């Protein structure tokens, strides 16, 4: 969108320019204060070649971001909205659940406005885990607008997501230039911000933040200051801004971003990118190559995975139970811990049955008799 006019672009073209774009006049932009990223539902008319019209002009506007145009005029800018800690939990362990989503819900609960990062070495099942989380959120929370953003991914992964995930899939495959990666990511972020300004709950599942940062590093003008791994000192500012946009908004609306970060690839650049994003999220899910090598999935390192301020998402009862379970798992290796939890989850239907099933493991796992008695009483 320019100062004089704009275009409506379709998700079928990944919001890039095409011959099917719809022309929006300057008067309409000023009247309804339309911004970049607004989703508009309206009426178009056939272009008149005699007047030099090449695109379908927008004749009438019915809705902007699912709201009446008159109500959108007075909306607050995204920057002026007050961010809060996530306090409404995504129910990803109730209906249409998988073993992976139950484990995530236990150890790294997700809330509306979460800024989560899935740390994953190659071939540990990060894309599969992301797909399962997406399907569970879409099924249990139809009020949430779900966007799956695939950057620098394989074409077959894109097709798999489009066919098996109930959400909007926006992508730029690895054979596309870095400029396209950046454009697609920017328009998705702008769309999400505009929807949040109108009070909607939006979830972006990004695969991956590492490749997006690589794309920004390629297109950003050099500052003359190069970090280890060949990363420009200013190149990570924009991907940080993308990831940092996730927040829970006071008085309604939220933007949740769950992104994957790739590690242990042998690339120094990937390690530098991960270190830059390591402390920016408020939820971290760590995947372990040792677990994946033993063909145990989901390959989650339970002791290294957690959510900050989880007391806002869990009830006091569940919080106490989780504290005791973590104390039990602290004595185990990552492989033993996930195997222990997975075995018991497969035999139970809900949380209550799961908590009862681990009572039998208390005596053999807790050495101190005093600690054992206290934990048995609490569980």
UniProtKB/Swiss-Prot annotation:
**UniProt: ATP binding residues:** 111-116, 123-128, 154
Asked whether the keyword Nucleotide-binding is assigned, the reply is: yes
Record-linked PROSITE patterns: RHO_RNA_BD (PS51856)
- What Pfam families does the entry give? ATP-synt_ab, Rho_RNA_bind
Its Gene Ontology molecular function terms?
ATP binding; ATP hydrolysis activity; ATP-dependent activity, acting on RNA; helicase activity; RNA binding
Question: Which residue intervals define the domain Rho RNA-BD in the entry?
Answer: 1-68
* SMART domains according to UniProt: AAA
SUPFAM superfamilies attached to this UniProt entry: Nucleic acid-binding proteins, P-loop containing nucleoside triphosphate hydrolases
Matching InterPro entries, A to Z?
Answer: AAA+_ATPase, ATPase_F1/V1/A1_a/bsu_nucl-bd, NA-bd_OB-fold, P-loop_NTPase, Rho_factor_ATP-bd, Rho_RNA-bd, Term_rho
- The EC number on file is 3.6.4.-
Member of which family?
Answer: Belongs to the Rho family.
What HAMAP family does the database record attribute to this sequence? Rho
What does the record note on quaternary structure?
Answer: Homohexamer. The homohexamer assembles into an open ring structure.
Q: What does this protein do?
A: Facilitates transcription termination by a mechanism that involves Rho binding to the nascent RNA, activation of Rho's RNA-dependent ATPase activity, and release of the mRNA from the DNA template.
Name of the protein in its database record: Transcription termination factor Rho
- Species the sequence originates in: Karelsulcia muelleri (strain SMDSEM)
Lineage runs: Bacteria, Pseudomonadati, Bacteroidota, Flavobacteriia, Flavobacteriales
**Gene symbol?**
rho
């Amino acid at each position: 969108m320019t100062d004089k006019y704009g275009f409506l672009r379709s998700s079928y073209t990944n919001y890039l320019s095409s011959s099917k774009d719809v022309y929006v006049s300057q008067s309409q932009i000023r009247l309804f204060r339309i911004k970049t990223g607004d989703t508009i539902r309206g009426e178009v008319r056939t272009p008149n070649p005699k007047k030099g019209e090449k695109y379908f002009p927008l004749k009438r506007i019915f809705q902007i971001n699912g709201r009446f145009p008159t109500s959108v005029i007075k909306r607050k800018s995204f920057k002026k909205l007050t961010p809060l800690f996530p306090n409404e939990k995504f129910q990803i362990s109730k209906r249409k659940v998988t073993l992976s989503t139950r484990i995530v819900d236990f150890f790294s609960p997700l809330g509306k406005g979460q800024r989560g990062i899935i740390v994953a070495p190659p071939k540990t099942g990060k894309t599969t885990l992301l797909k399962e989380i997406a399907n569970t959120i879409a099924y249990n929370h139809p009020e949430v607008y779900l966007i799956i953003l695939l950057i620098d991914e394989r074409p077959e992964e894109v097709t798999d997501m489009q066919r098996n995930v109930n959400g909007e899939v926006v992508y730029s495959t690895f054979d596309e230039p870095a400029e396209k990666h950046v454009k697609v990511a920017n328009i998705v972020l702008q769309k999400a911000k505009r929807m949040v300004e109108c009070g909607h709950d939006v979830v972006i599942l990004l695969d991956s933040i590492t490749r997006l940062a690589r794309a920004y590093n390629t297109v950003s003008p050099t500052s003359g200051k190069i970090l280890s791994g060949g990363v420009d000192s200013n190149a990570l500012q924009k991907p940080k801004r993308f990831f940092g946009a996730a927040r829970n908004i006071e008085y309604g609306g939220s933007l949740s971003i769950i992104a994957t970060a790739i590690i242990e690839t042998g690339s120094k650049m990937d390690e530098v990118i991960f270190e830059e994003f390591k402390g920016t999220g408020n939820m971290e899910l760590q995947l372990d190559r040792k677990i994946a090598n033993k063909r145990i999935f989901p390959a989650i390192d339970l002791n290294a995975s957690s959510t900050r301020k989880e007391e806002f998402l869990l009830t006091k009862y569940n919080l106490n139970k989780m504290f005791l379970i973590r104390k039990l798992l602290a004595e185990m290796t990552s492989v033993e811990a996930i195997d222990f939890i997975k075995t018991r989850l497969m035999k139970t239907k809900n949380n209550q049955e799961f908590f009862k099933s681990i009572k039998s493991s208390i005596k053999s796992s807790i050495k101190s008799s005093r600690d054992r008695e206290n934990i048995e009483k609490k569980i």
